[in-house]
Amino acid sequence: MYDALSNFCDAIRAAGLEPPDAIEPGRLHRFPGNGKRPSNRAGWCLLFDDGRGGCFGDWSTGITETWQAKRDKPYSRAERADFARRVEEAKKRAEAERNARQADAAKRATAIWNAANPAPGNHPYLIRKRIQPHGARIHKGALTLPVTDFTDRLTSLQFIAADGGKLLLSGGRKRGCFIPVAGDKENPGRVIICEGWATGCTLAEDEPTALVLAAIDAGNLEPVAVSVRRCWPSVELVIAGDDDRLIPGNPEATKAKAAAIAASAQLALPQWPEGSPQSLTDFNDLAQWIKEVSHG
């Protein structure tokens, strides 16, 4: 069984995930998704009781993989059929747990959102970013932002502290969901999708007639963009990406480009004026820097 467990963990690592320290056969385990903080539980795995196979995945990226132990004797048709059946059962089990956690998170999000008051315009984060509240609320001193799907269902919340620290409500559905920043979702003529909420506020204030959606992070740009294209096939769609020029490979801009290609959208990246600091990365940074320069 040790070899099976070791090989199963190797398969999980090969998919870009770090498996939990202890895996008990027959039990569904949860662990952080790819690149997520230690408290995250988007990753999951289940090793079958006999150690001959298992499956795993990452709900934050949408991947699902299977693993089957190698042996000298080929698996029979009946064994292959049994393996396929057990994989489907494991996937359904993981899906049921995810749905239950997301339903619970949605209830908690609704309760917090309904009890929260409108955010004051003098919140330190708003002042530092030079943006308006745009419907944000306040909960325990943090800006509270709704995360919704395309049916307007509240799925989670994002909290932004005075110092800019960000946190998503645990267990909530994020993939394919977004923070509605501004604009009319009934019949939009132009949709702009960006990563962060502050960037979205800057874009909304610059283009007040556009529907602006914040995808929360670069990895969620493509799922949101594809859904926008599905909802409004002929809409003018713009992916306003971040430009992390100092990071090798510029992953944020790369993901923005991939989202634009997948959704047949325009790609917009900040155009940096001569002399602007290389530490600037997004449209909010650009807008703030221009204001500072213009005011001396």
Tell where the protein language model's regions lie, with residue ranges:
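Short, solvent-exposed polar/charged micro-motifs at secondary-structure junctions
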Residues: 28-39, 144-146, 277-285
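Short aromatic/hydrophobic-glycine micro-motifs
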Residues: 14-17, 131, 265
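Non-catalytic accessory segments of DNA primases and related replication-initiation nucleases
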Residues: 1-124, 244, 251
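Nucleic-acid enzyme cleavage-core boundary/entry regions
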Residues: 20, 38, 96-143, 148-163, ...
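Phosphate-handling DNA/RNA-contact segment within nucleic-acid enzymes
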Residues: 104, 142-233
